[in-house]
Amino acid sequence: MITVVAKLQAAEGKQDELRAALEEMVGNVKQHEAGKATMYSLHTSDADPTLFLFYEQYASQDAFDAHGQTEHMKAMGAKLRGLLAGRPEVERYTQIAGV
């Protein structure tokens, strides 16, 4: 199981546009990657509503690799330009225990 945590900060005045784009991304993953992305959850910070966090889990390395190569993810990369205050912070984790 591969886990990814990504933080995205909205550019000034772009919070609503970014949120809409990220919600669209969740819908595309749900529609096109069912069974590969076992968790793809979007959150916003309680302390800073311009800060968004994705919590993602993938069934395998192949599923994770395929996610980045989908047409909807490639299109989203272009859409996010101008909506972010900087580069997303992305960290990858490997699950070692859980219930």
Model-derived regions, located:
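Short amphipathic alpha-helical segments
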Residues: 14-38, 72
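Alpha-helical elements of the RecA-like P-loop NTPase motor core of helicases
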Residues: 16, 62-65, 74
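Short, flexible helix/strand-to-coil boundary loops that buttress conserved ligand/catalytic motifs
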Residues: 22, 68, 77
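Glycine-rich beta-strand-turn "strand-cap" elements at beta-sheet edges
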Residues: 39-50, 76-99
